[in-house]
Amino acid sequence: MPARISRATYAQMFGPTVGDKVRLADTDLIIEVERDLTTYGEEVKFGGGKVIRDGMGQSQLSRAEGAMDTVITNALILDHSGIYKADIGLLDGRIALIGKAGNPDTQPGISIIIGPGTEIIAGEGKIVTAGGIDTHVHFISPQQVDEALNAGITCMVGGGTGPAHGTLATTCTPGPWHIARLIQSFDGLPMNIGVFGKGNASLPGALEEMVRAGACGLKLHEDWGCTPAAIDNCLSVADHFDVQVAIHTDTLNEGGFVEDTLNAFKGRTIHSFHTEGAGGGHAPDIIRVCQYPNVLPASTNPTRPYTVNTIAEHLDMLMVCHHLSPAIPEDIAFAESRIRKETIAAEDILHDMGAFSIISSDSQAMGRVGEMIIRCWQTADKMKKQRGSLPDDRPGNDNYRARRYIAKYTINPAIAHGMAHEIGSVEVGKRADLVLWNSAFFGVKPDMVLLGGWIATAPMGDANGSIPTPQPMHTRPMFGSFGKALTNTSITFVSQAAMDEGLREKIGVDKQLVAVVNTRGGIGKHSMILNNAMPQMEVDPETYEVRADGELLTCEPVDVVPMAQRYFLF
C-alpha cells in the first residue's frame, strides 16, 4: 500500500517537488519546481537504513555494464533551460544522464544505474547549477582562481601576465612567449581557462602568431589604442581563425566616435565589455551598441547593481586601474567622463529587459572576481523590487527572471566564446562542472563545486576533527585541486590553429586543450538565450538620459542589497 506524507515532510526528506517554492538566499526571488523526473515512492537516497544499499537501490552492474561513476540524487536544477528536479548521472567527467536513478533490477523506470562502483552526492534540498563563466578576467594574481572557484565559477577567460602595468589595465596577454608561460601556469590551477591575446594592431601578423600560440580570443582595449583600423584588422584575423573579439572602446573619442567604431565592426560579431561605459568605452553613449544584432553586450560587476555607493567608489578605482595620476587634471577629467549615474541606472533595466546579455567581473581591475554571481542576483532582486514581475513570469514565482539572469553567467558567455559545446549548462554530454548550493546560501557560498565530475572545493571543518564539520568551517581545496587530478579534470580553451600546430606537446602542458568553435558569423545577439532584446537606443549627449524604444530608463539607487553583510562578517 502506498503511504502518504505531508508536502513539508517530503521536501525535508527528498527535496522540493512540483509546485514547491524556494527562496534564493535572502532575496525576494522565488523559484518554483516545474517538473520532477524522479518517481514518487521510488526515490533513491543514501544513508543508514536508506535506499541505496546492495540489492535495493544499488544494482550489481559494473561500470562497463552501464553504472555511473557518480550520481547526484534528487537535485533541484536551476538552468537557463528550466527549473526542475532530477537525479544526475556523471560518467567520465561529463553529465551522462539526467532523469531517474536506481537499480533497474528492483525499480521501474530507471534511466541512471547505480552500481557498486558509483559514488553518491546527496542533492536533496540542494540547488544544482552549471559552473559560472567569467569572461572578463585580468590575470593579475593566480589567487583569483581560489576566490572564483570558491564562489562557484568554473571557467575564467581573460588575459594578462601578472601585476604588470599592462595587465593591471587591460585584459590581454601580449605575444606568444607570454601566452605560452601563462598556459603553462594553468597546470597548477583548478579551473577551466582561456586566454585573450592583445588585439590592438593595424596589421595581422602579430595577431596571427598570438592565435597560433594558444589565444582563444583577442582583446581590443583603448589603453593600447582602439582605433577603427585596429578594430577592423582584429576582426578580420578573428574571422580567419574562428576566435572571439572582446572590446573596450575609446572613452575619449580620440580615434572616432561610437558610430566610427560601429562602422569598423562591419556587421561582424563582437563581445562588448562593460557596455554601460563606467568600465570604459565611448563617452557618453557606448551603451547604444546593445541594439545591434552583431554586438554581444556585457556588464562588469562594479556597477551591478546601482547603489548609493556606486558612484563614489568608482573614481579612485579607475585612477588606480588605468595608471592615472590625481595630480594631472586631464587624468581626472578622463576618469570623471566615464562615471555617469544616468547610464548606470539604465544598465540595471537593460539587464532586466534582456538587452544586456552577459555579466562578468573585471577582476582586480575595477571588478571583484568572487562577486560576479552575487552581483548578478543582487541586480535581479533590485529589479524585482523596483519593477515588479516580468511579463513572462507566472503568478507566484520568478522562474523566467531566474532563468534570464543565470543565463548571463553560464550559457551566454559560453556561446559568445565558442565554449558551449563543453560548458555553460546542465545538459547531457557537457562537462560535469557543477555547483551545489544550499538555497539559503545560493549565489553566495557554494556547498560543493565539481570540476570535470570531481570535487574541487567544498566547505570543510577541522581536518583533525572526529567528523567533517567542527569549526573552523570554511571552504577548502579538495582532491580535485591537486596533482594530476587537477590536470585531468579541468581544461584550457585555445584556438583550433593552436591545436593543429600541436601546442600541448610544444609547450609541454598536462591539461587537455580544447578548441573554441563557432564564435563568428554563426552567432549574434539572437544567440543570447533569454537575453536577446534589441531596443532602439538613444542617449542625450548633455543630460546622459537613456531611452529604449522611446522610454526613459531610470531607477533609484538602493541603500541595502541582499547577499551581503548577512553572509560576510569580515
Swiss-Prot record:
Residues that hold substrate according to the record: 221
Amino acids binding Ni(2+) 2: 219, 248, 274
InterPro entries listed in its UniProt record: Amidohydro-rel, Metal-dep_hydrolase_composite, Metal_Hydrolase, Urease_alpha_N_dom, Urease_alpha_subunit, Urease_AS, Urease_asu, Urease_asu_c
EC number: 3.5.1.5
Pfam families in the record: Amidohydro_1, Urease_alpha
Record keywords: Cytoplasm, Hydrolase, Metal-binding, Nickel
Gene Ontology CC entries for this record: cytoplasm
Cofactor(s) named in the record: Ni cation
Protein's GO biological process: urea catabolic process
Reactions catalysed, as given in the entry: urea + 2 H2O + H(+) = hydrogencarbonate + 2 NH4(+)
Known pathway: Nitrogen metabolism; urea degradation; CO(2) and NH(3) from urea (urease route): step 1/1
Active-site annotation: 322 (proton donor)
CDD domains with a match to the protein in the record: Urease_alpha
Modification(s) after translation: Carboxylation allows a single lysine to coordinate two nickel ions.
Binding site for Ni(2+) 1: 136, 138, 219, 362
Subcellular location: Cytoplasm
Record-listed N6-carboxylysine modification sites: 219
Recorded GO MF terms: nickel cation binding; urease activity
Gene3D superfamilies named among the record's database cross-references: Metal-dependent hydrolases, Urease, subunit C, domain 1
Family: Belongs to the metallo-dependent hydrolases superfamily. Urease alpha subunit family.
Subunit structure: Heterotrimer of UreA (gamma), UreB (beta) and UreC (alpha) subunits. Three heterotrimers associate to form the active enzyme.
HAMAP family: Urease_alpha (MF_01953)
Protein name: Urease subunit alpha 1
Species assigned in the record: Brucella melitensis biotype 1 (strain ATCC 23456 / CCUG 17765 / NCTC 10094 / 16M)
Gene: ureC1
